[in-house]
Curated annotation (Swiss-Prot):
Subcellular location field: Cytoplasm
Record's signal peptide: none
Coiled coil start-end: none
Domain of life: Bacteria
Keywords from the named record: Chaperone, Cytoplasm
BP GO terms, sorted: chaperone cofactor-dependent protein refolding
GO molecular function: ATP binding; metal ion binding; protein folding chaperone; protein-folding chaperone binding; unfolded protein binding
Lineage, top ranks: Bacteria, Pseudomonadati, Campylobacterota, Epsilonproteobacteria, Campylobacterales
Disulfide bonds: none
Assembly and interaction partners: Heptamer of 7 subunits arranged in a ring. Interacts with the chaperonin GroEL.
Organism: Sulfurimonas denitrificans (strain ATCC 33889 / DSM 1251) (Thiomicrospira denitrificans (strain ATCC 33889 / DSM 1251))
PANTHER family in the cross-refs: 10 KDA HEAT SHOCK PROTEIN, CO-CHAPERONIN GROES
CDD domains: cpn10 (cd00320)
Protein name stated in the entry: Co-chaperonin GroES
Amino acid sequence: MNFQPLGKRVLVKRVEEANTTASGIIIPDNAQEKPSRGEVVAVSSEVKEMLCGDKVLFGKFSGSEVTLDGEKFLIIDSEDIFGIIK
């Protein structure tokens, strides 16, 4: 994929979370919350705090969902990312 975010934005691929509870109950797709974790796929030249491959935590309603090469991603302002998961 060839995509370069502009401004202070990053392109993030959501990390899918388990769809079962600890006790084994399966949660249907329409009842699941959208994941608020992801992996940075592309970074604007203005963003210095993050690198491609970083695992990040962001708000549930952050960013704009886009489809590139048949995959869903989020374009998020770097200020809407809470932190990097180490």
